[in-house]
Amino acid sequence: MDKERYQAEYTVLSQRVPENAFRFFNTKGESKRNPYLRIAVFTKSGNLYNLHMDLSSFPASIPPVFVMKMLKDKDGNDLSGTSACMHTLSSEHGWTRICHYGYNDWTPAVSLFKVYVRCHLWLEMYEAHLQTGNPRDYYLKHA
């Protein structure tokens, strides 16, 4: 991500997300090798989730997004693997990786704020799954 794109992303996020709820890491100087964004999400039920967005190939590629803990489904199983109905991808770092954009939907014009919104919706549907047992796909079908 170049300097101009970083500034645009930072500006949009700071206008729409509390400034103390997100922070970019490794985006300047020599540390640009593994840039990432940490952003907090509060669901309607008041739960806090911390997200880690890997920006190493952003905006050319879909940024991998992880909930910074291993989530469990309603039955207590780890959401660690690829699941079409739960919209998860293979875990890394011991964290649940969520599927927020399909390859056919991705363009370099997609902002980190849009990624954040989709991840927030994913978490709301995850919490609905915990209440009802319905998979995330029940609320939002694949295109």
Which residues fall in each region the model found?
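UBC/E2-like fold recognition across ubiquitin and ubiquitin-like conjugation systems
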Residues: 1-52, 58-143
